[in-house]
Amino acid sequence: MDLTSMAMQETTAAAEEDRLPCSEVPVKEKTKKITWVRKWNSTDVFHILFIGGLHVLCLFAPSTFSWKSFWVCFALYAICGVFGTTLSFHRNLTHRSFKLPKYLEYFFAYVGLHALQGDPVWWVSTHRYHHKYTDTYLDPHSPIEGFWFCHIFWLFDSKYIIEKCGRYENAGDLMKQSYYRFLERTFVYHVYLQAALLYLFGGFPFIVWGMAVRTILGFHLSWLVNSVCHRWGNRPWNTGDLSTNNWFIAMLTSGEGWHNNHHAFEYSARHGIEWWQIDTTWYIIKLLEYLGLATDIKVPSEIHKRKMSFKN
């Protein structure tokens, strides 16, 4: 019996006992306890110091506020978060829902690197494992292991994640390209470069607003998709997992909160399937198509929609 089958059996057995709050899918929540007293590897130490340090820097936001710093924060969030993480890392690199000229693919991927959520290889690999093992005990950030585990604590136990999922075996399409191998090896140096440039052009206020506030905002909005959108919302599609559509999270994340749509049609470049579901990232992709830059754009067919509908 393979690991996927075992995980599904565990989830099915647990499902007979309890439900997550406000969810239509029954499952027993088994909180994953982070072992704080242990031998920490360098990855986990970096994660907790980096994320913790950024949160501490955010405490200086009121005293360092200026409109110039605010607009730097806003611009970098829009560019790195929307074009980088959402459009590039997620919809382009992970799911291959559309194609870009290689130079533009590489540029957007580098922009995504500066959202500071990890290098493209790590991000793509982790998210592909999430879709392969969605909401089972093999999911890297499974909601059945507790809200705070799937929101943030999973980042502090890389050994546990590797033991569950493996490393980059599912991201071979990126690892065979020297550009992505380079970004994977040198990620931390790009973090230092970003900090140095922000300090050079705006001093400590730019570090606080352009790096800390902007990055922490992006972190928690992305993490809310993992935690909230696998717990609260509506489920128009029969995905067999806990994914939900949450309009509030969708508004905050440029369309990523239409998460049940995404799990039903993960290959789709469009997450806001209905006309009224605002999906800013989709509008950008359509603009790129109009400019002749985005091609082979994938969206769900009416046949596939009928197949995935609860009304089927």
From Swiss-Prot:
Fe cation 2 binds at H130, H230, H259, H263. It is found in: Membrane. Coiled coil: none annotated. Its cofactor is Fe(2+). Catalyzes the desaturation of 20:2Delta(11,14) and 20:3Delta(11,14,17) to generate sciadonic acid (20:3Delta(5,11,14)) and juniperonic acid (20:4Delta(5,11,14,17)). Fe cation 1 binds at H90, H95, H127, H131, H262. GO terms for cellular component: endoplasmic reticulum membrane. Its main location: membrane. This is Acyl-CoA C20 Delta5-desaturase. One of its GO terms (molecular function) is oxidoreductase activity, acting on paired donors, with oxidation of a pair of donors resulting in the reduction of molecular oxygen to two molecules of water. Expected to bind 2 Fe(2+) ions per subunit. The histidine box domains are involved in binding the catalytic metal ions. A motif (Histidine box-2) lies at residues 127-131. Pfam families: FA_desaturase (PF00487). Its EC number is 1.14.19.37.
